[in-house]
Amino acid sequence: MIKEIHTHKSPKPIGPYSQAIQIKNFTFLSGQISQTDNINTNISFQTQSILQNINYILESKEMNVGNIVKTTIFITNLNDLTIVNDVYQKFFLKYTKTFPARSCVEVSKLPKNAKIEIDAIAYKNK
């Protein structure tokens, strides 16, 4: 059974998609961007904001980023990856010592002039 997940703690989607979908023990989170004034915010702030929003979505299903098994990062400038990695590592270490599998891809542009977008897949034993 497919179940839509939505929390008011995380920004609502900017298009026709769900914040996340749960199928049995897996939760598939849509790509998250920082929905602030992305032109004037740095990559560190955007990454922190996205990870917090992802965590809010997971908390609504009694999980946290420690349940994430895979992330995909879309970034507009791979030169920013060192900064992203620093924020990402510090955030995950608050919840787990095991980092999820990950892919990272440079893209030419993201919605709302975001510098980064992250999607995730989480797993929870029931």
UniProtKB/Swiss-Prot annotation:
One of its GO terms (molecular function) is deaminase activity. SUPFAM superfamilies: YjgF-like. PROSITE patterns: UPF0076. CDD domains: YjgF_YER057c_UK114_family. Belongs to the RutC family. It comes from the Bacteria. GO terms for cellular component: cytosol. This is RutC family protein bbp_334. InterPro entries: RidA (IPR006056), RidA_CS (IPR019897), RutC-like_sf (IPR035959), YjgF/YER057c/UK114 (IPR006175). Signal peptide: none annotated. Pfam families: Ribonuc_L-PSP (PF01042).
